[in-house]
A protein has these predicted regions:
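Beta-propeller blade-edge and WD-like acidic-aromatic loop motif
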Residues: 1, 26-52, 68-70, 74-94, ...
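Conserved beta-propeller blade repeats
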Residues: 2-23, 49-71, 99-118, 151-168, ...
Length: 191
């Protein structure tokens, strides 16, 4: 499929590992109506390239540390969800198996197992910010921190993903939203 005439190739979601020695990137190519994605890691000098995931779909990713990456993807053997993967291996763990909706994960700077992530709008246009522990393979640790309304006028190209981000002390999360009718930056404190 990659070499079919008319295929379009793109890379995005480039992110350096915490020590700056490796990077990850989503390599995407489009062939007709079909989209393919691979999660690739590589040394900063271009050596030691590794296809970490070549399953049906890979979306948002985040380095946990210099050797592990959490990603939302649809694995052939596990379905859609968040997966914690070890770089340069095919080893992975399906975390929070009850969650099957894509979001933007990021790790707490003061707790290496705590992850914040968001959701896209539900049918009732509600988006959520959640936290959970990545060593939880049942889903008991997942808690909703905030629910916000996403008006229909902000959809498609003008949508506003929440993109939750940690404050450096791990005591608050900021996020983008349009629930007040305009784009804004908001903060939710962590108890």
């Amino acid at each position: 499929e990659m070499q079919e005439e008319g295929s379009v190739h793109k890379v995005n979601h480039l992110m350096l590992s915490p020590n700056g020695k490796r990077f990850m990137v989503l390599y995407r190519w489009f062939c007709g109506q079909r989209k393919y994605t691979r999660l690739i890691t590589c040394n900063i000098d271009g050596t030691d390239m590794y296809v970490l995931s070549d399953d049906d779909m890979v979306s948002h990713c985040y380095w946990k540390n210099d050797e592990e990456i959490i990603a939302f993807e649809r694995k052939k053997d596990g379905g859609p969800g968040y997966y914690l993967m070890k770089d340069k291996t095919q080893g992975w763990t399906h975390v929070w198996p009850q969650l099957s909706n894509d979001g933007h994960p990021s790790y707490c700077p003061t707790n290496n197992n705590l992850v914040v992530f968001d959701t896209y709008p539900s049918r009732s246009r509600i988006q959520e910010i959640k936290i959970g522990l990545d060593n939880d393979t049942v889903g008991d640790s997942v808690k909703v921190l905030a629910r916000v309304f996403s008006p229909f006028k902000y959809d498609n190209d003008t949508r506003c993903d929440l993109h939750p981000r940690w404050r450096q002390d791990g005591k608050a999360i900021c996020f983008d939203s349009i629930f007040e009718g305009h784009r804004g930056l908001y903060i939710v404190n962590i108890d």
